[in-house]
C-alpha cells in the first residue's frame, strides 16, 4: 500500500550521521524527517556532524510537495556545517532528484550503487559494515 509519509531511521556517531529512508515521502514526511534530524543534532555539540550517509535501498519517491520541502531543508544544511553527503543504493531517478537538490551547494555529494561501492572508498566505516 502507498504510504506518503515515509519512514526513517537516524543514528549519529560524530562526525557522521546515518539516515535510512524507507517508502515514499510527502511534505509531512519530510517535515518529520527534518524534525528527527534536528532532534538528533541537538544531542551533540553544534557542528560536530560533518558527514551524512543516506541509505536509499528502500526509498521509493518524493511527492512534489515533498521535493519542495526537501529543497528548503537542504538550503539550511550549509549552516549545519555538513561537508559531505553520501547516498548509498541510489537509483537513476533518485540520483537525478538529489543532484537537483544539491546543485548550487558547496557540500561534496557522492552517489554509490551499493554498500560495497561505498566501503571501497570508506573501508573504515564500521557502522555501515555492522548495520547495513
What are the roles of these predicted feature ranges?
Residues 2-132:
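Amphipathic, Lys/Arg-enriched alpha-helical "gate/interface" segment within cytosolic domains
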